[in-house]
Amino acid sequence: MLEMAAEVGDGVILNLFPRSFFPTMLEHIRIGAERGGKKLEDIEIVCRHQVVVTADLAEARNRMRTQFAPYYATPVYNNFLAWSGHADKAKVIKEGWAERDRNKTTGAMDDQLVDELACIGSVGECQDRIREYADMGITTHIISCPSPDALQTTYEAFTAENFSF
C-alpha cells in the first residue's frame, strides 16, 4: 500500500507503526515514488503521532495498551504488526482477542512496543522524538494525544511558541 500510494499519489499518511520499522517503510515509499517517476522528496509523508506529555509513564503506557491493542487485533493492523518485526506479539494479541481475554490482548503490548509506537515522556523528550521523526523523513506531523488528562499539556508543548524544528 505504501508503494502504491507513493506511485499514484502525492503523499502517504502513516499511523501506529513501530519507530524502528520506519526505515523499511520509507524504502517502500521510495520504491513507489520512483515507479511513478518521482523522487522520494516529492512525496509528502504525514504521520499521526500518539504523544503523551506526562511524568506518569505507566499510566500513559497502559492507556496506549487499552486503546490500541484492539486495533492490532484486526487483521490489517495485526498483519502489519507482524510484518514490522513483532510477529510474536501480533500472534498473542490475535489469540487474546479471539479468546475474549482483554488482559492477554493488552499484555502483549509490552513497554518496549508501546515506546516504539508512541512518544511518551517529558515535554523535551516528546519534542525531541518528533524532531527525530522529522530528521528521519516525516514531513508533516499530526500530534494526537490519547490521554484526556494530558491533552492540555501535550498540545501546549507543540504550539508555535513552544516548538519548532
Role assignments for model-derived ranges:
Residues 1-165:
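Active-site-adjacent structural elements that line small-molecule/cofactor binding pockets in enzymes
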